[in-house]
Amino acid sequence: NRVPYASTPLSVLECAEHLEHALQMARESIVLLKNENGLLPLDKKKVRKIAVIGPNADDEKGMLANYYGFPSEISTILEGVRQKAGESVEVVYHKGVNHVDNWLFNSDYDEDCFSINGKKGFSVEYFQNTRWEGVSPYTSHDERIDHRWGNGTEVGNGVITNDMSAVWRSQFKAPGSGEICFEVSADDYATLFIDGKIPEKRGLINNYYILNAKKGRTYDIELRYVQHGDNADVKLDMGYLESADPQKLAESVSDADVIIFAGGLSPRLEGEEMAVQIDGFRRGDRTSIDLPAV
């Protein structure tokens, strides 16, 4: 209560005046270093196809950065381009490259593959400790694991997201045979178990868990999550993993009139007390001013 901002009412958040002010700030913060041949602004009458590529193009976390509140709506770069382009311009998207390795995850989530106790989705137990100990004071059911909470948010029955752990369980029925990738993203961290074991894991900053599945077989899925403090999030996705192929990417966008690349750094690499340990980064701090090798 020492400063007037401490008594700001919730009704002020995202009010029309503030939204307009934030938009103007965003517009005036852009620095155009080069505009060769007057390319910008784009003329929708002359552009038939736009290719949007890069690891930051369709990533909500990249829009939020490191220290953030929770807007009611988040628009990624890809979504913004599609909105501005309208129906008259074709917009295609390829991730193309990852931040620091050559793995590319392609989401192909199928909610019909996950069920428990006769219900689609996951059972979940929450604990007010970081060790999954004792009797869970709050249990629930999620059709999908995809949560984002502010610091100290109550998830239910008095359990808050500070010094909290949770475990989701389900049975996964493989839709086909072959390699299936489960991507786990979490703040602070989460680990996936399949049939009681941690499966093969790939990726330097992304957690890609690999299952060599047999069509029709059922696998026990368990996701264990821990959150100590600050903002929290956890998400489970499924799809397939492939290696980046620059030549294939170039061929796939060769007919585009405009190519927009969204890459560089990311809050998935830089932050405070992170688990990232890769060349150029140590626990969220930079050890080099060079861009990642990719």
Predicted segments, located by residue:
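C-terminal non-catalytic regions of proteins with extracellular/luminal or membrane-system context
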Residues: 6, 12-13, 20-294
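Structural signature of the thiamine diphosphate
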Residues: 1-3
